[in-house]
Amino acid sequence: MENNTEVTEFILVGLTDDPELQIPLFIVFLFIYLITLVGNLGMIELILLDSCLHTPMYFFLSNLSLVDFGYSSAVTPKVMVGFLTGDKFILYNACATQFFFFVAFITAESFLLASMAYDRYAALCKPLHYTTTMTTNVCACLAIGSYICGFLNASIHTGNTFRLSFCRSNVVEHFFCDAPPLLTLSCSDNYISEMVIFFVVGFNDLFSILVILISYLFIFITIMKMRSPEGRQKAFSTCASHLTAVSIFYGTGIFMYLRPNSSHFMGTDKMASVFYAIVIPMLNPLVYSLRNKEVKSAFKKTVGKAKASIGFIF
């Protein structure tokens, strides 16, 4: 039955209603979030403290860690509170805020991934010009531009989604405030909103994916010209790890946002969103950083200094 009263709060259905699964899921999500927190904030601190990591590649990695922490924190704590207390309500303004920051950080990540791919292209394909290509100003502009695009995109999508009238129901068939489940609750004409999402997300993803694919195409060509089989295998292994994370990120994003609203199945979307919003931020420090010898060396030095400081105190 249609309700003509505008909603002031939403009810997030969550992942499951089974009471026996709430505590186990809370523990799992808490574990994932703690790894995300320690991994990403630890990576930022490590890069700041070690002068050997003050290079363009690690500058982008530190920003990637920041946005991973940002969009995970926009979603995961509220989900965990729901598991622990059973509180599924979220105020209208809180829902809009959660949606805004999630979109802002997820978009910034998309452009940062493209910047990282370009940085690797410059390092591997144009090594003699690398220092003049990836200057401090260029790196800063790429990072700042990623955040500007992120918050601009978030403003567009938040305004586009929350300008609609939600008078049919306030029950969101999802575990956080996202565009597809919110659009299904609207009693306004959703066509324009769906087209805005499709074209804006499509443009952002297409631009970033093209930069990544073209960069890696030249990288692979350069790798194939390497004479050392060991060096070639190592470079291929590194690129494969990066491309795996990129494929998961863009694959789930395209699956979520570049389909008509009528083809969304909330159960499937929830599972995709778990990977997109919660698991990927946990994996990125491992895929992009902890496999790196320079990061491992910096970590060992930091731990050694910490042990020495503790020994000196006691």
From Swiss-Prot:
The chain crosses the membrane at residues 24-44, 53-73, 98-118, 138-158, 195-215, 236-256, 270-290. Residues 1-23, 74-97, 159-194, 257-269 are extracellular. Keywords: Cell membrane, Disulfide bond, G-protein coupled receptor, Glycoprotein, Membrane, Olfaction, Receptor, Sensory transduction, Transducer, Transmembrane, Transmembrane helix. It holds the Pfam family 7tm_4. Residues 45-52, 119-137, 216-235, 291-314 are cytoplasmic. SUPFAM superfamilies: Family A G protein-coupled receptor-like. Glycans are attached at residues 3, 261. GO terms for molecular function: G protein-coupled receptor activity; odorant binding; olfactory receptor activity. It comes from the Eukaryota. It is found in: Cell membrane. InterPro entries: GPCR_Rhodpsn (IPR000276), GPCR_Rhodpsn_7TM (IPR017452), Olfact_rcpt (IPR000725). One of its GO terms (biological process) is G protein-coupled receptor signaling pathway. PANTHER family: OLFACTORY RECEPTOR (PTHR48018). Belongs to the G-protein coupled receptor 1 family. This is Olfactory receptor 5B12. It comes from Homo sapiens.
